[in-house]
UniProtKB/Swiss-Prot annotation:
Family matches, as SUPFAM superfamilies: PFL-like glycyl radical enzymes
Family matches, as InterPro entries: UPF0210
Provenance organism: Methanosarcina barkeri (strain Fusaro / DSM 804)
Name this polypeptide is given: UPF0210 protein Mbar_A3181
One Pfam family in the UniProt entry: DUF711
CDD domains referenced in this protein's UniProt entry, alphabetically: RNR_PFL_like_DUF711
């Protein structure tokens, strides 16, 4: 890969002034060879494998950060979905597995570990149900463990039994972490069409089709894109799209360079580069700010969905030109609590849940880090999930829900999670019930592929 001096100077500017960073270097580790009927033996096996494989991850990424001067914010691990790896365990629940994962993550000095996960888009096995029912206690008892459940795919439809169950699981998780504003729910995501190579939390897991061990990288550059657009003089939307493509190209080249060097030093296969524009609470490092730079008075105004579609498509086009290893989610994230512009838009009354839902039809993932009143019924949470899953299934894309029913909070309040998770204003929901619909259960069939209107 040839990189000229001008690109190096541009990258320095991006890092120093525009919040460019590598959001995560995530090591994916297969645990399929760790299976054992005795959960104690299984826990020993996964602890040994995780800590052995990841023992040099943090040191190596820190060295590369110092060498290139490019911040690497998080070092993470993803593992085989535990519901798969632990299927043969005879224990009544999998909480001890989550605790073992947490200990392994702490010993490896990584920020998060993902993969306390199950894939139940067509139905649930005994192991799947053990894992799902263990989630509230597991997230209460751990610091670094993240959980994800895939409940729908375009090929199979939506498992409404699983959707109904996840509303209750989210509610219970919030209650068990009420002393921290329900932060357990910030580490739990429900997917449609979940990718197997996603490096971002809380949805990362090491897919069944993945190799023994792999490095996946997630870049982040909303501030860079925002600055590039604002430097243009009265551009039309075609010119804005071209600028975003060129900027995404540069960001991607930097990310691939770092990812391949980490892989080379660790002797591990390089997997994918996720192009997702992941915002932070820092001013200017915001997807909402990009949309406003295009000409919207506030994110959430009419035209927001179109602007986001332009952004998402241009990022993918620019990134795909720069790398043949693009994967994961790759687009623009719209997590409310993690984006200063989104937070301000909600507080100004410009952005509501219904508009966010429309935006998810064209963005990278879905309803992300949404805080809602603590007294929200579990059935309403399930209905929110069902709506979002439908968007993903019909549009053949990944969608997800990460929602926090903040205990004791009402509309007008806010919750503070700190760090990259930021803070979130409590958003209002419909007062009308979806309970009967959710309780019907069953499966919403896969959509027809030939008649697409």
């Amino acid at each position: 890969m040839y990189i000229n001096p001008k690109e190096i100077l541009e990258t320095i500017q991006m890092v120093r002034m525009e919040h460019l960073d590598i959001r995560t270097v995530t090591m994916g580790i297969s645990l399929r060879d760790c299976s054992h009927p005795d959960i104690e033996v299984f826990n020993e096996n996964i602890y040994e494998k995780i800590t052995t494989r990841a023992k040099e991850l943090v040191r190596t990424t820190n060295e590369i950060q110092s060498l290139y001067g490019i911040p690497i914010i998080n070092k993470r691990i993803s593992v085989t979905p535990i519901a798969v790896a632990a299927e043969s365990c005879r224990a009544p629940d999998f909480v001890s597995i989550a605790k073992t994962m947490d200990e392994a993550a702490k010993d490896a000095q990584v920020d998060f570990i993902g993969g306390f996960s199950a894939l139940v888009h067509k139905g649930a096995t005994v192991g799947d149900l053990k894992l799902i029912n263990s989630i509230p206690e597991a997230l209460k008892s751990t610091e670094k463990v993240c959980s994800s459940i895939n409940v729908a795919t375009t090929k199979t439809g939506i498992n409404m039994d699983a959707v109904g169950l996840m509303g209750s699981i989210i509610k219970k998780t919030a209650d068990l972490t009420a002393d921290r504003d329900g932060i357990g729910c910030a580490k739990l995501v429900v997917f449609a069409n979940a990718p197997e190579d996603n490096p971002f939390m809380a949805g990362a897991f090491h897919g069944i089709g993945e190799p023994e061990c792999v490095i996946n990288v997630g870049v982040s550059g909303p501030g860079v894109v925002n600055a590039a657009i604002r430097e243009l003089e009265n551009p039309n939307l075609t010119e804005i799209s071209e600028t975003i493509k060129k900027t995404a190209f540069k960001i991607t080249r930097m990310g691939e360079m770092v990812g391949r060097e980490v892989s080379r030093r660790l002797g591990v296969e390089f997997g994918i580069l996720d192009l997702s524009l992941a915002p932070t609470p820092a001013i200017g490092d915001s997807v909402a700010a990009i949309l406003e730079a295009m000409g919207l008075e506030r994110c959430g105004a009419h035209g927001t969905t179109a602007a986001l579609a332009l952004l998402n498509d241009a990022v993918k086009k620019g990134g795909a030109m720069a790398s043949s290893s693009v994967g994961g989610l790759s687009g623009a994230f719209i997590p409310v609590s993690e984006d200063a512009g989104m937070i301000e838009a909600v507080r100004a009354g410009a952005l509501n849940l219904e508009k966010l839902e429309a935006m998810t039809s064209v963005c990278s993932v879905g309803l992300d880090m949404i805080a809602v009143p603590g007294d929200t019924p579990a059935s309403t949470l399930s209905a929110i999930i069902a709506d979002e899953m439908a968007i993903g299934v019909i549009n053949r894309k990944t969608t997800a829900v990460r929602v926090i029913p903040a205990p004791g909070k009402r509309v007008g309040d806010s919750v503070e999670f700190g760090g990259l998770l930021g803070n979130a204003p409590i958003m209002p929901l419909s007062n009308f019930s979806s309970e009967t619909f959710v309780k019907r259960g069953g499966r919403i069939p896969a959509p027809i592929q030939s008649l697409t209107n």
